[in-house]
Amino acid sequence: MVDSESQNDFANDGDNDSYFVSTQFESKQEEIMEKELQKLQTGQTVSQLLRFRSGISGLTSVTPKPVKVSRPGLRKTGSRKSKKNQSMSAMVKERFKTDKYAYFSGDQRKIDEFLRRLEGSEDIENMAMSTSGKDGSCLFTRDEWICIVQSIKLRFPELSTTKKKSLSAITRQINKQEKENEDENSIWSQARSLPSLELTDEDLKWLYDLDDEQMANRTITSSMTEVDGNDDHSPFVMTLSQTTPSQLSHIKESDSLYSQETNVQTTEPADHQSGHMQRCHSQTAEGKTQSKILEIEIVSDSEEEIESLIRNTEPDSSEDVYGANEVSSHQVPAVDALASFQSFPFAADMIPRNNVRDKEHESLHISSSIRSSPAQSLTQSQVPSSIDSIIEPPCESPRKMSPIRDTQPEPVITSPFKTPTKKSKELLSKYSSPVKNSIHNNMGSPVAMMVPRSSESAKHVEEIIVSSDEESVYSTAKSVFPSAQIVISEVEDEDEEFYEIVSSIPEKHKPTAAAKKRKLLQTSRYEVVSNFNINDYDDDQRGFKLRKLETKPIIIDSDNEIADSEEDEKNLSIIEITREVEAEESEHDTEYLINLGKQVEGNSKMNTSVLQVPSSPSSITFGRTDILKELEAFSNSDLDTDRTINSNTSKNSNAIKSGTNQTIDFTLLSTKELQERFKKWELKPVQGRQRMVSVLSEVSKLFTNSFNDPVPETRQGFEGTVYGSLNRLVGSNQYWHEKIISFEPLRVSELRDWICTKGYELEEDFLMRYCDDNGYCCTRQP
């Protein structure tokens, strides 16, 4: 039993193995057959495509090249090299010189096969069959293909997107042009257009044809010298113009053209009294002939050239000459060939005087010049009339000399109030002064002033101070008034003279010798942006004078500047205040300014610095409120109550004094509060509590004055209060004021030293900030 079972198991295992092997054979056979079929199909496809292979560069291998897997490399951070731009000629050559027909040049059968596969190529195929030979290998030559491709490129060029236009855009542009042509009805469009169809043949003949008489006269030259005086016909110029039908209807067939003949003949140069009589003929519409006598008198000159004459004619309004009212010409009248510069009316005023003096005793007989009325036509002729006139040179007027006196001449200064600038005066001597030369030549002088002269004092050198209209009329402490005179004192030597300027102050106001040593005059000037009503006021007790110099309007350039609404209809009032300063009060200040001026004058060459002038420089201008505040220094209970506040306005340079200030006690504040105060006012921070207290205390003196201004809490309020006090302080001093208005750089160290004398110890950084914010030139250079 056991053996039978084992045999059955073995038989079953053998059947299973044979079935497995058979299935493996079948799968392998199917794979082989599939590969063979695929290879066969590939071979058939390749054989079909091989017909399109080019003879020059054929396919070397059917198997595709293995594709390499490339990993993206790191991008370079460096700058890429810019490619060189190719010229247009190189691009054109590269495009049109490349051989694009290499594929078709190998085998003609490729072209035939390609054309057969194209849809809609029946006509071309039939044409190819008809034109081909027996072998059918020739369809088109190389040159024919090139012509076909070039024609396609010419008909359908590759335009850029900017140059391409759609059909709607082209239609819109054409309609716009047609509409403009319809609306264009100007005279130029009528003139450039051809004559309308309404013109008849006779009209065209009248316009363009010439008759026999006109054709015969075409040989006559236009030169007046070649015309024979006995010729009945004169040369003329004919122009053709296109006329509109409306203008043509006004012209009658009976109208005719008229010509004028003028022959000019000159007499001998020596004959000054004989004239040539010439007859001018004119033919009117009725055929009548009128003649007028034209008398021209020729006057010879000393030179060989013919002197041209000034011709004047008077219009004859009694009759219409040459039919001027019938036909009007558009031609410009011809210029006489003999006309020269002397023939024009304005030539007499431009002739030099020496030429007139040379011909003083000559009598010039000049005929009247041709005049034409503005209301008459340009071609209307005038009948001349002979008018002899004699031009005599104008006699020189006698010189106006002042009565002779034995005293020495005292030139009077006619200059008004002048500022002490570099070019405020101009000294003119007797030998080089153009004013005196013009007086001698009687040519007129711009200076309305006559200096007394005498025969005895003619040898002395005189110096005259001439004022200019461009000079300023504002007065300062150094101003010279009109009543001042120059006293000329002679010494034994005639070449040396000493001048002494006499003061213009009245005798009652002149200080004595002792007073001159003890008192000093100080002048200040305010510019108030308003029409400030003020009366001149003199206070002898307190020693100050107040006057209003001028009120000038504020001129705004409307083209380059936008006017502020607050500045409309306002004027600029200029007020001058002069006061006497006691020597005891200003002795220290005066000595300091004198020494400072000497130092600056001595080091003017070494300390010269070149700085940029600020873009918005302006003189120190104070408002109405600033001047009203200054009244407190000059207020007096003895003044009349009916006087206005404006009449008491004056300048007090010492209004800000440290003695009257009520400073804030910053020592009671903590360090944190002091730092906050620095931040609010944007001051430069310093180290140390004592240093912070010192800086704030000195700065606070400028706004804690007698006016009890509130302590500012913001930067704008701080700058407005402190800068206003500094402006009044600096503007009260003539030295610093002149430096500011002349844009001279301010040395911050010197300005700080001067302010320290007034009781304010400010930092240089703060003064630099003050100058920069106000547009003042400043420098730290010592």
Curated annotation (Swiss-Prot):
Residues 374-388 have a biased composition (Polar residues). The lineage of its organism: Eukaryota, Fungi, Dikarya, Ascomycota, Saccharomycotina. Keywords: DNA damage, DNA recombination, DNA repair, Nucleus, Phosphoprotein. It is found in: Nucleus. Phosphorylated in response to DNA damage. One of its GO terms (molecular function) is 5'-flap endonuclease activity. Regulatory subunit of the SLX1-SLX4 structure-specific endonuclease that resolves DNA secondary structures generated during DNA repair and recombination. Has endonuclease activity towards branched DNA substrates, introducing single-strand cuts in duplex DNA close to junctions with ss-DNA. The keyword Nucleus applies. This is Structure-specific endonuclease subunit SLX4. One of its GO terms (cellular component) is Slx1-Slx4 complex. Belongs to the SLX4 family. Forms a heterodimer with SLX1. Disulfide bonds: none annotated. Residues 73-84 have a biased composition (Basic residues). GO terms for biological process: DNA recombination; DNA repair; DNA replication. Pfam families: Slx4. Residues 63-91, 359-425 are annotated as: Disordered. It comes from the Eukaryota. Its main location: nucleus.
